[in-house]
Amino acid sequence: MSLSWRKRREVRLSPDGLEAFEREKWTGDVTVVLSDHFARYTIVQPQDGATAEEELALARFQFNKIHGERARGWEVRLSRAGAGARLACAIDASVLERLKACFPKGGKARLVSVQPALMAAYNGARDRIPREGAWLLLVEAGRACLARLAAHGWASVHHVAEGEWERLIERERSRAGGESLPDLVLKL
């Protein structure tokens, strides 16, 4: 007999679905995959001898530098440490609080995980990504997220209008300055 009796579900949440999500009576274990409309990304280069807290502080600094004062209210997380650059993700803390409020302690449901769409897609495709890297393309209503993985880790991440991703790849190729870029585009 399995001890895992709770129903598990994954819910994909778009910006126009947040209020409906809050009205739902959830049961079981729930993983929320947030649309990249909710997420901001930046690349954090490895820092010799830096602690995890210092790298997180660097990610927060980069978001503040890029987005200004509004970034102060964001929750920031870093991808797992590896040999190369890491991906930092920021999500407005008020959105996360609204999600958590849907799952009171002792209730019939438990919020197991909240993941931005790019990271959920990456985790699902990780085994298909060649060692030399690939472009990861995640298309959502009205926009696309295009990330580049290189042999040395995360190399770039951009949000563009839904139909602009091919131009963005060409622009990245022209700016590469001799750097080897992947040919493979994984549409996730």
Could you describe each region identified by the protein language model?
Residues 1-188:
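Hydrophobic/aromatic-enriched cytosolic interaction surfaces used to assemble or bind macromolecules
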